[in-house]
Regions:
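Hydrophobic packing residues within well-ordered alpha-helices of enzyme cores
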Residues: 46, 95-99, 224, 272
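A structural signal for short hydrophobic beta-strand segments in well-ordered beta-sheet cores
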Residues: 59, 188-191, 252
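Conserved beta-loop-beta/alpha segment of the NTase-like Rossmann-fold superfamily
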Residues: 96-97, 104-188, 225
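Short, well-ordered beta-strand micro-motif
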Residues: 61, 83-84, 190, 215-217, ...
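N-terminal glycine-rich phosphate-binding loop and ensuing alpha1 helix
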Residues: 2-96
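Residues at the starts of beta-strands that form the adenosine-phosphate
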Residues: 32-34, 82-84, 108, 139, ...
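Catalytic-core segments of class I nucleotidyltransferases/pyrophosphorylases
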Residues: 141, 148, 153-169, 181-183, ...
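Short beta->alpha linker loops
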Residues: 64, 90-91, 116, 258, ...
Length: 279
């Protein structure tokens, strides 16, 4: 089974070049970039924890006093990024209460509120472009803070910027950060003419998977204006990614699967708490 999955991986993925940037290049990019925190979603599978505290899941206080949003901001801050915008709707005030204006973290945080109704990540970015909290002249990194980067060796922001700039040199407008696959959550079987020949517990399925982090160049903003409005809830991944892929203008940067934790249920939250206590 593993050999078959390896062949499948080779058929759908080939890596790009290894990218490197200088300290000066990183600083220049960071100074001309806004990091958008997508913190407007409801987080229904963690509703028991969030509703009891009237708190957005990315603002939940971990036992060490931290939050998912705070961890994400510090990761980018330590790489030189200073300008952030939180795209808020559900339990917006809880996010504002935790993050404030960012001064206690050494950064600047603006807020862009979804207009009256949730509009998804596509609409939220369109709204932030319209209200000026994402300047159209600046680069943009969109990070969903419930997609936590953990156990990463080196600087995650530096590496994704290096990968993005390599893609820009090839005419790309955006870079999707991915892992090389995800564990299958069930018992896998190899079957021949009805006979089970092999069992693989929780096999690793080698399909490149987006980790909720995307880097955009300013030239991508016209797509948000054309594709999204503020009348319905739409995430940009389902609409914009296929179009950019068709045009061959979407690049990728791959990180190890062990460095991504999608915190969307109580089990994943408990895992984050465990890992955070070891840092």
């Amino acid at each position: 089974m593993k050999a078959a999955l390896d062949n499948f991986r080779d058929a759908i993925y080939s890596p790009g070049e290894i990218a490197h940037i200088s300290d000066t290049e990183l600083q220049q990019f960071a100074e001309n970039c806004v990091v958008a925190l997508a913190v407007g979603g409801e987080g229904s599978r963690l509703k028991a924890a969030t509703e009891s505290q009237q708190t957005h899941k990315t603002a939940l206080r971990l036992p060490n006093g931290d939050s998912m949003a705070g961890r994400t901001i510090r990761m980018f801050r330590d790489a030189g990024f200073r300008d952030f915008v939180a795209l808020v709707f559900h339990h917006a005030q809880s996010v504002i209460d935790v993050l404030g204006d960012g001064s206690h973290l050494g950064v600047r945080i603006a807020y862009s509120h979804d207009p009256e109704r949730p509009v998804g990540r596509g609409g939220a970015i369109r709204n932030a472009l319209d209200n000026g909290s994402i300047p159209r002249t600046k680069n943009l990194i969109v990070h969903n803070p419930d997609d936590q980067i953990i156990r990463y060796e080196g600087s995650f922001p530096r590496d994704i910027v290096a990968g993005h700039l390599l893609g820009v040199q090839r005419g790309m407008l955006a870079t999707a950060v991915v892992v090389d696959g995800t564990p299958y959550t069930y018992t896998g079987m190899k079957i021949d003419h009805g006979v089970v020949e092999q069992i693989e517990m929780y096999p690793y399925i080698p399909i490149p998977t987006h980790v909720g982090v995307t880097v955009f160049s300013p030239k991508a903003y016209d797509y948000f204006t054309k594709l999204f409005d503020l009348t319905k809830k739409v995430d940009f991944e389902s609409v914009l990614f296929p179009l950019l892929a068709q045009e061959r203008r979407l690049y990728s940067f791959m990180i190890p699967g062990r460095c991504w934790l999608s915190v969307n249920d109580p089990k994943a939250l408990a895992r984050l708490i465990e890992l955070a206590q070891k840092e």
